[in-house]
């Protein structure tokens, strides 16, 4: 039974300095622990054939399917503000691209598939814990409606990897609209290779921004398109309390997807200064810093594109600055529209921005749980007089008590009835997110006891994040004091 991949590879047709051709390193005993069957079907793959010994070998990198590109992509990047001229796929190999059933080109990448020319001192492998974390969180993000890479499969390798502590090895099959990053442009721009920057820009326009090809200035339209997608993406993160944790330029997707989950986490108690990543000592990538950091990253992209925007560098800089100036308006519009929907506001009033900001301020002052505060407000929309369940979430409800009558007054101006409002609010305010302590418990069960039942259960719960599931009520609960996760780790 042959596993067929309908590859249609475009990135591997670019010049050889865009990547290194390298085969995955075979593993001792591949064991498929999870296959995303609906995603496989969407990609035009046969899930029954993938769910086989041959399929496990392919998904572990032991067998390379016919037609695979098998390349490690080159890129650079600013890591915590410091430029590194060469990073690249140090433990990931792009098998190739397929056209999915929606007509969209998708990358199929093996993460943890062995050393590449970009591995530096790394072993090229991935540990089971980070693989499960990325599988859980990326699929949860998709269910939440956030643009994201996806997880097709997780495979145990039968080998151990040297981490602290030693862990079982695993490989994640990651699906993305592409793995092109801001850092990919930086790789060539930092070397003064304008021809490569132009070739990459042309490839990105054809693949992700075809409308830019028809614009008077295609490269400006490309920059504006990336800015718009990133602004919208970060606004979506802010609606669900998501903290990426490592927003380096090499982790900023040109396609506008969330990528490289590493030390990501979700906020419990609302605090804009929240940081979980063990390596983010200065809070550079704290929850509230994510919008300005996104703009900082986009500015690095704009610097790469300046020579394409005008033959005159000064004029090119001016054009780029004007484009970057649009980020704030785009982000603020998406952010405020998202907050309005979360508060049940279908129309717009001048005081809405202040109303939303004051609710967040009340949550911060009262140390309320971010996700549950919005969800309980949704539940209360059927009877706005009774906000007791919301109030109970606040350690100090003083600011909330001052805010609540203003919200009641504001929604009274809406034409919607309470039932319709509640329905719409519940569609944007999830009851289930990948709570850090729940994800950690799942990882511990798998790593310490080879027990994947909790992994399957959390995936099932998170696949319906907006629908209350009585038997899984515990997944909605914030952590008890002894359950709190204070730090997350990138796993490399």
UniProtKB/Swiss-Prot annotation:
InterPro entries the record matches: SelO
Enzyme Commission no: 2.7.7.-, 2.7.7.108
Residues given in the record as Mg(2+) binding sites: 251, 260
GO function term, MF aspect, one: ATP binding
NCBIfam families: PRK00029.1
Cofactor requirement: Mg(2+); Mn(2+)
Family (UniProt): Belongs to the SELO family.
Active-site residues (renumbered): 250 (proton acceptor)
Keywords: ATP-binding, Magnesium, Manganese, Metal-binding, Nucleotide-binding, Nucleotidyltransferase, Transferase
The organism of origin for this protein: Rhodopseudomonas palustris (strain HaA2)
EC class: transferase
Catalytic activity line of the entry: L-seryl-[protein] + ATP = 3-O-(5'-adenylyl)-L-seryl-[protein] + diphosphate; L-threonyl-[protein] + ATP = 3-O-(5'-adenylyl)-L-threonyl-[protein] + diphosphate; L-tyrosyl-[protein] + ATP = O-(5'-adenylyl)-L-tyrosyl-[protein] + diphosphate; L-histidyl-[protein] + UTP = N(tele)-(5'-uridylyl)-L-histidyl-[protein] + diphosphate
The keyword RNA-binding is assigned to this record: no
Task performed by this protein: Nucleotidyltransferase involved in the post-translational modification of proteins. It can catalyze the addition of adenosine monophosphate (AMP) or uridine monophosphate (UMP) to a protein, resulting in modifications known as AMPylation and UMPylation.
Residues bound to ATP: 88, 90-91, 111, 123-124, 174, 181, 260
Pfam families: SelO
ATP-binding as UniProt keyword: yes
This protein's name: Protein nucleotidyltransferase YdiU
């Amino acid at each position: 039974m042959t596993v067929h991949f309908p590859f249609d590879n475009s990135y591997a047709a670019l010049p050889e300095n865009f990547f290194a051709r390298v085969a995955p390193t075979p593993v001792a005993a591949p064991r498929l622990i999870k296959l995303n069957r609906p995603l496989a079907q969407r990609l035009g793959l046969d899930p029954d054939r993938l769910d086989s010994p041959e399929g496990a070998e392919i998904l572990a990198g032991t067998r390379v399917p016919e037609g695979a590109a098998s390349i490690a992509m080159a890129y650079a990047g600013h890591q915590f503000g410091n430029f590194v001229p060469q990073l690249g796929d140090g433990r990931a190999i792009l098998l190739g691209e397929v056209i999915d059933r929606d007509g969209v080109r998708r990358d199929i990448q093996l993460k943890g598939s062995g050393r590449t020319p970009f591995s530096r001192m790394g072993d090229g492998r991935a540990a089971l814990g980070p693989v499960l974390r990325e599988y859980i969180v990326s699929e949860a993000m998709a269910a939440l409606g956030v643009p994201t890479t996806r997880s097709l499969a997780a495979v145990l390798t039968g080998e151990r990897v040297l981490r602290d502590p030693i862990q079982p090895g695993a490989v994640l099959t990651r699906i993305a609209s592409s793995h092109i990053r801001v850092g990919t442009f930086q790789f060539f721009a930092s070397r003064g290779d304008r021809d490569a920057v132009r070739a990459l820009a042309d490839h990105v326009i054809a693949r992700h921004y075809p409308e830019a090809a028809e614009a008077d200035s295609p490269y400006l339209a490309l920059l504006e398109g990336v800015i718009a997608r990133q602004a919208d993406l970060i606004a979506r993160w802010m609606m669900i309390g998501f903290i990426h944790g490592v927003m380096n330029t090499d982790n900023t997707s040109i396609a506008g997807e969330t990528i490289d989950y590493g030390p990501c986490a979700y906020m419990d108690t609302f605090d804009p200064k929240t940081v979980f990543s063990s390596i983010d000592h200065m809070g550079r990538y704290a929850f509230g810093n994510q919008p300005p950091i996104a703009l900082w990253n986009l500015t690095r992209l704009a610097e790469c594109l300046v020579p394409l925007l005008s033959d005159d560098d000064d004029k090119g800089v001016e054009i780029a600055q004007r484009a970057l100036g649009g980020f704030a308006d785009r982000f603020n519009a998406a952010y405020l529209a998202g907050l309005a929907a979360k508060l049940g506001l279908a129309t717009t009033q001048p005081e809405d921005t202040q109303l939303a900001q004051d609710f967040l301020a009340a949550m911060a002052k009262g140390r309320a749980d971010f996700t549950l505060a919005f969800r309980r407000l949704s539940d209360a929309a059927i009877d706005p007089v009774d906000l007791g369940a919301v109030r109970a979430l606040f350690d100090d409800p003083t600011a909330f008590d001052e805010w609540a009558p203003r919200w009641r007054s504001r929604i009274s101006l809406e034409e919607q009835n309470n039932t319709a409002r509640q329905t719409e609010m519940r569609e944007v305010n999830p009851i289930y997110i990948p709570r850090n302590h729940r994800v950690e418990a799942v990882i511990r069960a798998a790593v310490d006891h080879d027990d994947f039942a909790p992994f399957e259960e959390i995936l099932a719960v998170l696949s319906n994040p907006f629908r209350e599931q009585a038997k899984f009520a515990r997944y909605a609960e914030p952590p008890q004091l002894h359950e709190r996760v204070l730090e997350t780790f990138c796993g490399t």
